[in-house]
Design a protein with these regions (language model features):
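Conserved class I S-adenosyl-L-methionine
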Residues: 14-57
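Class I SAM-dependent methyltransferase SAM/SAH-binding core
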Residues: 63, 69-113
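A conserved beta-strand element that flanks and buttresses the S-adenosyl-L-methionine
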Residues: 124-125
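A short glycine-rich, Lys/Arg-flanked "PGG" loop and its adjoining helix->strand segment in the class I
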Residues: 138-150
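Conserved beta-strand signature within the Rossmann-like core of class I S-adenosyl-L-methionine
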Residues: 151-158
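Acceptor-substrate binding/catalytic loop of class I
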Residues: 166-183
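A SAM-dependent methyltransferase catalytic signature shared across enzymes that methylate proteins
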Residues: 181-198, 215-218
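Core SAM-dependent methyltransferase catalytic element
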Residues: 200-218
């Protein structure tokens, strides 16, 4: 765990930590420019994005949850001919996304309270879903199911084991949480997803733990 030094009274520090834990987007608002400058430009996620693309129809609709500034994942999907809607709770990150892709649709929303009038061929929650507290994560699988067409694909990242962690980025604390793999499997099964791929700690992809699943409602 990495936290900024205690430079305020203990109660204020505790309240600040709890706010950062429950609403990571507030931290991203503070580091949006830093993140845009320091996130690696290369698409190390490409093998997973390419596999997803092979499972989608031409010009498929994709919902990018936690799209950030849209680079590099959303940009790559757009270049491939897909229709992408970006959602993020960070206003500052979304401002950058709109500058990067002015012709695209972006929505300022917390994924936990998602409200969109469309269903999609795929949902991506890459390095965004795992910023939610563990107590909020199970509820997301109903949301994933609600916004996918039958046969739609879900691509998300998690931790490799149950727990919490903090990382210091641009001088701000970023909270991460994960359930364990069996919990995710049960949640996917309960919400009628079939697991296509589960890779743990992929060293070629920044040690990401990646899930790809298909929504097959009965």
């Amino acid at each position: 765990m990495i936290l900024k030094p205690l430079d305020e009274n203990p109660r204020a520090f505790f309240l600040n930590v709890m706010s950062e834990k429950e609403n990571v987007y507030k931290s991203y608002d503070k580091i949006a420019e830093w993140f845009a400058s320091n996130r690696p430009g290369q698409l190390i996620e490409k093998p997973y994005i390419d596999r997803l693309q092979l499972l989608l129809p031409n010009q498929a609709t994709i919902l990018d949850l936690g799209c950030g500034n849209g680079k590099p994942i959303m940009g790559y999907l757009l270049q491939s001919g897909f229709q992408v809607v970006g959602v993020d709770a960070s206003e500052k990150m979304l401002d950058l996304a709109k500058q990067n892709f002015p012709a695209e649709t972006f929505l300022l929303q917390d994924m936990r309270k998602l409200q969109i009038g469309n269903k999609f061929d795929a949902i991506i929650a890459w390095h965004s879903f795992f910023h939610l507290p563990a107590i909020d994560q199970p509820k997301m699988f109903e949301i994933f199911a609600n916004y996918l067409v039958p046969g739609g694909m879900l691509l998300f990242t998690s931790g490799s084991e149950r727990g919490e962690a903090w990382g210091l980025n641009g001088g701000e604390n970023l909270f991460h949480a994960s359930l364990d793999s069996d919990e995710y499997r049960l949640l996917l099964q309960h919400h009628q997803f079939e697991i296509i791929n589960h890779t743990v700690n992929d060293a070629a992809c920044g040690n990401a733990t990646v899930w790809l699943a298909q929504f097959n409602p009965q």
